[in-house]
């Protein structure tokens, strides 16, 4: 049986049976206990907006993006200006970003977030688990991306990166 050919009692042929069964499971779970994730985009946004703790001082929802197609975590690169005009500082990388803006045509400006005590070598970070999240700070390094190139976003708990 291929996609769309599975039959479940009470589910019409036009409906996706896996989708319907998962909906039924969620409905049943919601009847038993509040179905709330401790960490999710919704929770991070609520924390940022102070809905869970007003006046908490949080200002950023850090995100990790996953490239469409291979579904691998996206690592951004950039550098600050060097010590003088026309010079480039040390190249840095990060899997974790602060969304600065999103345009109508789904392009976004992302700022690299890093722990200043984490080594800055670009080869050091092979995947998001290699990156320290203990003391993320804004870097001032921004990149522009096409959001149509991503298939997944992970929101980390809301934090404060500005003093």
Q: What kind of feature is each model-predicted range?
A:
Residues 1-163:
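Short glycine-rich, low-complexity segments
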């Amino acid at each position: 049986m291929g996609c769309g050919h599975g039959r479940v009692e009470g589910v019409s042929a036009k409906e996706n049976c896996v989708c319907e069964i998962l909906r039924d499971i969620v409905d049943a779970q919601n009847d038993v206990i509040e179905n709330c994730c401790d960490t999710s985009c919704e929770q991070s946004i609520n924390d940022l907006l102070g809905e869970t703790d007003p006046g908490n001082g949080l200002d950023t929802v850090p995100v990790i993006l996953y490239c469409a197609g291979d579904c691998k975590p996206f690592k951004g690169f950039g550098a600050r200006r060097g010590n003088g005009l026309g010079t480039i500082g040390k190249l840095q990388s990060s899997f974790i970003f602060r969304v600065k803006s999103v345009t109508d045509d789904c392009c976004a400006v992302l700022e690299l977030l890093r722990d200043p005590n984490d080594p800055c070598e670009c080869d050091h970070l092979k995947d998001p688990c290699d990156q320290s999240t203990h003391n993320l700070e804004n870097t001032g390094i921004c990149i522009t991306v096409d959001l149509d190139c991503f298939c997944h976003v992970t929101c980390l708990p809301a934090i404060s990166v500005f003093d």
